[in-house]
UniProtKB/Swiss-Prot annotation:
This is Probable intron-encoded endonuclease Cox1-I1b. One of its GO terms (molecular function) is DNA binding. Belongs to the LAGLIDADG endonuclease family. PANTHER family: INTRON-ENCODED ENDONUCLEASE AI3-RELATED (PTHR36181:SF2). Its EC number is 3.1.-.-. It comes from the Eukaryota. Its main location: mitochondrion. The keyword Heme does not apply. This protein is coded in group-I intron 1 of cox1.
């Protein structure tokens, strides 16, 4: 009980500091003569949007974690104020979301990893009024509305593209369609190639882009070549031809796990809960094997289990070794950018603090409910 008392006391102190700093910063910014009226209006709108966004998040958090348990209270207070204080120099409380980047973090490699997990390259044809075909290329990343933060992080770093909401599916989509924007993203994927079978989607996507950009081809020739690409897409290979050992980096892996990884707690018996880590992919056995070696070395590599389901073969890289869990907890600290960061912090804290069974059960239920909010069709390991 002592650790809980300390957490509660710290929470009260943090709350007073946070509210005090909010008032101080607002008074300074709104009364400063250095800021124009337009600047003040923009600031107020920014604070309003930030407040409403965090209010929505905190309500979701209460629904997920209905308890006065001090760990939950502390997390909720940090969660509410993280966006505002990440922008100011007086921050004294760490955010539930990571605002820092690991040493030698590469955004471009991270983006390639995230795209390998959740990216989509599309080539579409549309009939227009004069009977001609209009071809369009689209690169997009889709996330649940609850995880819109990560798409904003991408848009802010790239400085291009647009975000829009799909109300019917409760998702947010980051989209690139303009040729000059696609050129920038193509340069990134040329420098750091995709490591999954999406390499071939990108290969045809770039091929189509070059055809559309070729001024020496007339409309008929372009249409003919693009139709050939659509036929070629049906016979794509299942693996990327890229040297995995050369291009698999920590930044790529952070992005890939952000999209495809799972940190979970699994109840093995009525009195025992274990921590686990898993990545599941279709066909990507060589990639999972390389991730295993990259993280854990070949001597302690977890087994990759193949599960045959219909015509698709699923491969799962999973481990629950306490030694490996502690390593992952340290290795990925403050690395993730979206809701995965909150999931990981809860998982990591429950691992390091040696929680009792009841506390682990609460942490497990919280992680599952968070996943149900931001994952499309997420699945959790069944209790044994």
């Amino acid at each position: 009980m002592k650790p809980q008392t300390k957490l509660s006391e710290n929470s009260s102190r943090c709350e007073k500091v946070l509210y005090s700093e909010v008032i101080t910063q607002l008074i300074y910014f709104l009364t400063s003569k250095k800021i124009t009226n337009l600047g003040k209006i923009r600031l107020v709108k920014s604070i309003r949007d930030s407040f409403l966004s965090q209010l929505e998040n905190i309500l979701c958090f209460f629904l997920v974690y209905r308890t006065t348990y001090s760990f939950g209270v502390c997390l909720m207070k940090r969660f509410l104020f993280n966006k505002f204080f990440n922008r100011h120099p007086f921050t004294r409380v760490k955010s539930c979301f990571s605002s820092s980047s690991p040493s030698k973090f590469s955004f471009t490699q991270w983006l390639v990893g995230f795209t390998d997990g959740d990216g989509c390259f599309s080539i579409s044809k549309q009939k227009i009024k004069n009977g001609k075909n209009k071809w369009s290329l689209t690169f997009k990343l889709t996330q649940n509305l609850y995880n819109y933060r990560i798409l904003y992080f991408i848009k802010r770093n790239l400085g291009i593209g647009s975000l829009y909401k799909e109300s019917s599916t409760n998702t947010v989509i980051y989209r690139l369609r303009r040729r000059e924007h696609l050129k920038k993203i193509i340069d990134i994927f040329d420098q750091f190639p995709l490591l999954t079978k999406k390499y071939w989607d990108y290969y045809l996507f770039k091929k189509a882009f070059l055809i559309l950009e070729d001024a020496n081809l007339n409309s008929f020739e372009k249409n003919s070549k693009l139709e050939e690409i659509r036929i070629e897409k049906k016979s794509l290979k299942q693996y990327s031809p890229v040297n995995l050992e050369k291009y698999l980096t920590k930044s790529w892996l952070i992005g890939f796990i952000e999209a495809e990884g799972s940190f979970y707690l699994l109840q093995k018996s009525p009195v025992r809960i274990i921590h686990g880590f898993e990545i599941t992919q279709n066909y990507e056995q060589p990639l999972l094997a390389q991730i295993s070696e990259f993280l854990f070395n070949s001597q302690i590599s977890p087994k990759i289990k193949s599960k045959k389901n219909s015509l698709i073969t699923n491969y799962s890289l999973s481990t629950s070794s306490k030694e490996r869990m502690l390593f992952l907890s340290s290795y990925f600290e403050n690395c993730f950018k979206g809701v995965k960061s909150l999931e990981f912090k809860i998982w990591s804290r429950s691992l390091r603090k040696n929680y009792n069974f009841e506390q682990l059960l609460r942490a497990r239920d919280l992680i599952r409910k968070l996943k149900n909010k931001y994952s499309r069709g997420s699945q959790h390991p069944k209790d044994k």
